[in-house]
Amino acid sequence: MAARPAFGIVRQLLRSNARGCSSGAPVTQPRPGEPSRPTREGLSLRLQFLQEHAAPFSAFLTDSFGRQHSYLRISLTEKCNLRCQYCMPEEGVPLTPKADLLTTEEILTLARLFVKEGVDKIRLTGGEPLIRPDVVDIVARLHGLEGLRTIGLTTNGINLARLLPRLQQAGLNAVNISLDTLVPAKFEFIVRRKGFHKVMEGIHKAIELGYKPVKVNCVVMRGLNEDELLDFVALTEGLPLDVRFIEYMPFDGNKWNFKKMVSYKEMLDTIRQRWPGLEKLPEEDSSTAKAFKIPGFQGQISFITSMSEHFCGTCNRLRITADGNLKVCLFGNSEVSLRDHLRAGASEEELLRIIGAAVGRKKRQHAGMFNIAQMKNRPMILIGVLLMLQDSPPARWSNFSWDPLRVRNPSARQCLSDQMASLWKRHCIPKALPLSQQCLGSGSPQRHYSSYPDPDTHSKCLSTGSQAPDAPSGPGPTSNQLTHVDSAGRASMVDVGGKPETERVAVASAMVLLGPVAFKLVQQNQLKKGDALVVAQLAGVQAAKLTSQLIPLCHHVALSHVQVHLELDSTRHAVLIQASCRARGPTGVEMEALTSAAMAALTVYDMCKAVSRDIVVTEVKLISKTGGQRGDFHRA
């Protein structure tokens, strides 16, 4: 195995300095002011009493399926000191202005509120949380919150060895370290930075300080590090590690792609061939990991099966992004800005109502989307995990399937990198014009939807940065008579049997003028019927597929791709809709695109009509079409 020499060095390095501490909690010296052992025993009895006589869990943190959310993940920063290839472009990503990020006091205010309502575990994430200057102070102040039992941290390990002693003294009692390879050269290739030995020093320091287990997160990618599976497992023989193998989220385009993704069952089979005595360990109801142990080994391994076997039914997690948005589901499409309400002077009761409403809308699984395996890329580094960006476009865009929608945060932090904007420009549907040439910002939140792989979420990236190449405008050759009427004036379906099959693409648009009241409710996802934009996109996709049943003389077309894109325009209180369809065949797909856009617009109307009847559906029109005997068309 290629990784063996480096693996041996790694294991020797870790073993040579490990102290063999076996306590289940971090080993720390008593600090001044700490209670004596008898007092601690008294506290334990009190804790036992409180557990036996606990009040009902907070209704604000309990969703409609009875899940009690006692685990909060807080992103301390969007910044990272690595540039992992599967995470972000080498130049990084645009960041939120500092003024829009949560301050330390705001973080602690929200943490205090959640802990008061029943959260007993907080994990600090990023970006990379250890590059935040006041991270030790934050941990210390969180440690003072009554009722908070666990303070954890997920880190890339670069700064861990230097900061961990102070963090432990401040109250940090759980550490997860990300490491995808045991080969130094491969590490540098993956993260585009040096630092492998710093990460190993961090793992060693965590073991030395008595953290047990030290959790090591490894994203397994076919063709990159799956050959190191056994080496990672072997580390647990003499070290108190919990090596957690994470299924790679295969965002190579928009389809479920097994080429890079290594499933949990495949990994398990590989490991069992080497260690047939591998035993399954019991797990907590809310655990995301399937734990295993090899008899006689000091550590264990786990699998996080977010792709092949979801764990939504027992989810107890909530997330707060670095800019203060509450996410109730990692794969969900709605965020609520707690920062804005805090800064507007909301009371604790008002904040709890906002939080409770968001938790109450949480779906049964994966934000109500059919299956995570059918979903495409979504930005994640800004909610505490990695942003999956592909280095090259898929071979054929026509292979894309539609994607259930995502709500986008307005800030520039979610704008596409120049690299992805370039891919969008070169490989999007030919000649499709952007809906708007202007930024829709003006200080109000913007929600952005698309079924393309990680499309731009800030309107300026949809303008000059991703404009399609110039193309001839105006109609191409046209017929001088109606094609669906015979010589006697009767309706007649065109015979397309003799026409050649060519690639056909059409883009249509529509606009819904909502008015300020309905627009605000849609923008904040507060409609009683639910998320208007999500439902509208689904309706648009469905309508495209049913066009031949709605338009009497329209041929049935086997569509290879449908995209419905919705964007909020705060300057006009409008929803802008763009629908595109692609197929290969003897007839065009203009009607499919127009029907899709129109139905999406009508669905927005239906979702909002209880709020206002003064809603206008307008500008339903063809934007462009390519393929066919009459040539291409691009609206000027």
From Swiss-Prot:
Residues 64-279 form the Radical SAM core domain. The keyword Transmembrane helix does not apply. This is Molybdenum cofactor biosynthesis protein 1. Isoform Mocs1a and isoform Mocs1b probably form a complex that catalyzes the conversion of 5'-GTP to cyclic pyranopterin monophosphate (cPMP). Mocs1a catalyzes the cyclization of GTP to (8S)-3',8-cyclo-7,8-dihydroguanosine 5'-triphosphate and Mocs1b catalyzes the subsequent conversion of (8S)-3',8-cyclo-7,8-dihydroguanosine 5'-triphosphate to cPMP. One of its GO terms (cellular component) is cytosol. The modification Phosphoserine is found at S64. S-adenosyl-L-methionine binds at Y86, G127, S178, M249. NCBIfam families: moaA, moaC, PRK09364.1. Gene3D superfamilies: Aldolase class I (3.20.20.70), Molybdopterin cofactor biosynthesis C (MoaC) domain (3.30.70.640). The lineage of its organism: Eukaryota, Metazoa, Chordata, Craniata, Vertebrata. GO terms for molecular function: 4 iron, 4 sulfur cluster binding; cyclic pyranopterin monophosphate synthase activity; GTP 3',8'-cyclase activity; GTP binding; metal ion binding; S-adenosyl-L-methionine binding. GO terms for biological process: Mo-molybdopterin cofactor biosynthetic process; molybdopterin cofactor biosynthetic process. GTP binds at R73, R123, T154, K215, R317, L318, R319. It comes from Mus musculus. The modification N6-acetyllysine is found at K198, K528. Its cofactor is [4Fe-4S] cluster. Binds 2 [4Fe-4S] clusters. Binds 1 [4Fe-4S] cluster coordinated with 3 cysteines and an exchangeable S-adenosyl-L-methionine and 1 [4Fe-4S] cluster coordinated with 3 cysteines and the GTP-derived substrate. Residues 1-383 are annotated as: Molybdenum cofactor biosynthesis protein A. It is an enzyme of class 4 (lyase). Pathway: Cofactor biosynthesis; molybdopterin biosynthesis. The active site is at D606. Isoform Mocs1a and isoform Mocs1b probably form a heterooligomer.
